């Protein structure tokens, strides 16, 4: 607490500097001091700071609270959107797509590609020629049998011609409030894989998939991880528990080795997806598995920090 107070004091004295200002706001929200964070943010807004990084930070706050109209406008300032893909293709801003082609590409993380790919479904109702580019590592997760939609990996991203382009993150603003038929999932599960794990999973007990930590050097750490031993009481329940993550931190290894967790973290994502389909519940911190399990309409309990990502805010009411 002393170190946090010293950091806040230093940042408060130097908040005229954008880096200090953004970090100060982030710290206030991260430690649950939301009123102080909001006050600093309001003060900055009144100064009419017009910088892409500040606008992006503000957009995340607005989106979390549900101010989608203003939030998505400012969200266009995010640095990930400004990668120079398809520079000669016009950006789509809601124009009529009849007899037109459009490229959608994921410019953010794997979880975003999985979670937000559902917005390709309503797009496919108004466009007859959609090409969706995703990271190579998750290409096989997507269903290539959806009408008007072709899934492509990023390794084939060069020399593609279309009438329009849009990032997946920007596509959300057009369809976030549309009801999407959950039977038209963009994520596929191969039946033979699903049946294989059906034979392995003992249905005489509750079957729970558990993810308690992410990549140790990943974004948002350590706020996206929980010490495994804190699940001790839960793991003593009369249920089957499956480890889905492929990395166990060194501090967790002693408890992990003596726990009754069944380790399936070595599986590839296609197999993990099939396993999840056979489980009753997924309990996970904010990692790829939260996006994946919820996108499969599996009952999913999210273990979130005090100041979670905007994706887990008001957007989830739609």
PLM-predicted stretches and their roles:
Residues 1-281, 286-318:
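Alpha-helical solenoid repeat scaffolds of the TPR/TPR-like class and their adjacent stem/linker regions
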